[in-house]
Each structure stands twice: as C-alpha cells, then as structure tokens.
Amino acid sequence: FRAAQFGIHHFCTMALNPREANDDRVNDAVMAVLPRFLEKDGVLGIGEIGLDDQTKKEEKYFTAQLELAKQHDLPVLVHTPHRDKKKGFQRCIDLIRDCGFPMARILLDHGNEETIKITREVGCWQGFSIYPNTKMDVHRMVAVVREYGVERIVVNSAADWGISDPLMIPKLVQA
C-alpha cells in the first residue's frame, strides 16, 4: 500500500526468517499470520527461510514454510548459515528433499565458491550476497562467474547488518 502511494509496484518475499525462528516471542505468531500475507499481490515467494544457527527449531519452521510454499505454489528463497556453511547448505538441501519440494524452485542464498558446485549438482538457483568486508566480495564473485557462467545465479547486495554497501551490484558490473 505504502509503495503504491508513490507509484511503485512493490514485490517481495515473506517469511519467518531463521534468525527469528528460535525466538518464542514471535515464531508461532508470525507463522499464524503468514498464510494470509502469501495471498497478497506482489508477494512472489516465501523467504528468507532456512538455517542460521542450525537448530531443531529452525528446521521445524523451515520445513513448515516449505509446506506453505507447496500449498501456495510459490518459489522459496533460502537463507544459509554464515558459519559451517557447507554443512548448513547440505542440511538445507536434505530438508528440501525430505519435503519433496522441487529443487528448480529453490534459491539457496549467501553462497560462495564452495557451495556453487553443490547447487549445480542438485539443480537449485544459487544466490550470492556481495558485501564489502564479509561474505562474497566483487573480485571473488567475478572469479565465480568466469568459472561457472551466469546461468541460475542471482547476485544481491544489502544494507542490513553491519557494514554493507547497497551499490555493490553496479560495482560488480564495472569489475
């Protein structure tokens, strides 16, 4: 509604983020209202869902939201852990498979050079978050694109936690 007041057709994904999945003050309340938001115009998928600290609660809400995505025929944006990334990527893939969700409708985000091989093997989309000091930087991303091409790759930047630069994508294009 707010974006439309300024002539902007806003698109987004909606979810209980894994960072909040462990917070009993909000997790069930968010899950209770989430289905009604998934019906709204402009909601293109469910996400970010996934794992952060790789807890049983995160797994519970991850699989519950995968089921919602199936019910609403929506693609899924998956947050993968920043720590113990390879293990977390594999656990996300295992949970997705266990739910029977189509891999081609999954974007596994926050990837790196180590995870691109995994996503290529299973048929997911691979997301890369470009940050100035953490996650992927411009030069590492250029190397990934040179080696693997751009097929099934999504690159994003952010202005969220800590030091970030929302203009990293134009900087990547110039590199």
Regions found by a protein language model. Give the residues of each.
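Mid-domain alpha/beta scaffold segments of enzyme catalytic cores
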Residues: F1-D73, V78-L95, H110-E114, E121, ...
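Short helix-capping segments at alpha-helix termini
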Residues: A4-I8, D98-P102, Y148-G149
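Short, charged, surface-exposed secondary-structure boundary motifs
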Residues: D23, K135-V142, S164-D165
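Short hydrophobic/aromatic-enriched beta-strand-loop microsegments
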Residues: A104-R105, W125-P132
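Short acidic active-site motifs
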Residues: E114-T115, R140
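Short, acidic/turn-prone active-site loops that include or flank metal/cofactor-
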Residues: I130-K135, A159-D160
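Short acidic/histidine-rich active-site segments
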Residues: Y148-P166
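Mid-to-C-terminal alpha-helical segments outside catalytic/metal-binding sites
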Residues: P170-A175
